[in-house]
Design a protein with these regions (language model features):
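Short flexible/disordered coil segments
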Residues: 127-140, 204, 236-246
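SAM/dcSAM-binding transferase cores
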Residues: 1-19, 25, 33-42, 48, ...
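C-terminal substrate-binding/active-site "lid" region of AdoMet-derived donor-dependent transferases
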Residues: 158-223
């Protein structure tokens, strides 16, 4: 196990990684997993819930993906940032408050250096979401903001989700990782639905680990079943994600809430 020590001036947690078999895991000073990578396949996605955070691809014609802009609030192990920039060829911006996490991703998780297509910004996700700089410019917004104990979302207010919605283009989508088996999940879902409208919010069934991925569209638009099936096959064949399975475990949250 290797680690980058805590900075006394920031109070941010120690960043370290561990290797178990063929997989490398990112930790923030605890045993909780904050991200992962196959070192011999650094641009693929290892964890199921992180794969599902690419579920927004079902809403988009494949030929349009390369022209879209992605943003991650929370870098983690850089998995989504690497996938969007390297696999999909998207213009990708990641916001991360902890400089040690950025260093760890570059040292241990093969995050490429900044380029015209890839930018890592050291900053506070709440401030970025509230700022006008990126407003209405983001096509897909990944939100995965948990503390070092992974207990509950660090940012989880209606005001924050409203700011996130303002970042999106009219056809944009916010994708959030929540713990579906925790008491906070229902409250988080209620806040997201209040901001985006319940009919524009979709959720995957929880993974075995309890992660539920929620997708919220700025403007509700659902492709026809034939288009969804065609896109799922394209996603599997070209990008190596289990999108056909997604169609069986993804549903509008309004149905589950009885609306």
């Amino acid at each position: 196990m290797s680690r980058i020590k805590r900075s006394a001036s920031t109070g941010l947690p120690t960043v370290n990684f561990s290797d178990h078999g063929p997989v490398r895991y990112l930790h923030l000073g605890t045993d909780w997993v904050q991200g992962s990578m196959w070192p011999d396949r650094p641009f693929d996605i290892h964890l199921d819930y992180v794969q599902r955070m690419m579920g927004w691809l079902l809403w988009v014609p494949p030929e349009e993906v390369v022209h879209l802009k992605a943003m991650q609030l929370g870098l983690g192990a850089g998995t989504l940032t690497k996938f969007c920039a390297k696999k999909l060829g998207m213009h990708t911006t990641a916001i991360e408050i902890n400089p040690q996490v950025v260093a760890a991703c570059r040292l241990w998780f093969k995050l490429p250096p900044d380029s015209e297509r890839l930018q890592v910004v050291l900053g506070d996700a709440a401030e970025v979401a509230a700022h006008s700089h990126w407003r209405a410019q983001v096509d897909v917004l990944h939100v995965d903001l948990y503390d070092h104990e992974a207990a509950a979302p660090v940012l989880d207010s209606e005001a924050f989700y409203a700011d996130c919605r303002q970042l999106l283009t009219p056809s944009g989508c916010m994708v959030v990782n929540l713990f579906g088996r925790s008491h906070s999940y229902a409250r988080s879902l209620e806040k997201i639905s209040a901001v985006f409208g319940a009919d524009a919010v979709w959720a995957f069934k929880p993974t075995r680990e309890g992660n539920t991925v929620v997708m919220a569209q700025r403007t509700r638009a659902v492709p026809e079943p034939d288009a969804l099936l065609s896109r799922s096959l394209h996603i599997e064949q070209h990008w190596g994600l289990p999108a056909s399975k997604w169609l069986r475990v993804l549903a509008p949250t309004a149905l589950s809430q009885g609306d």
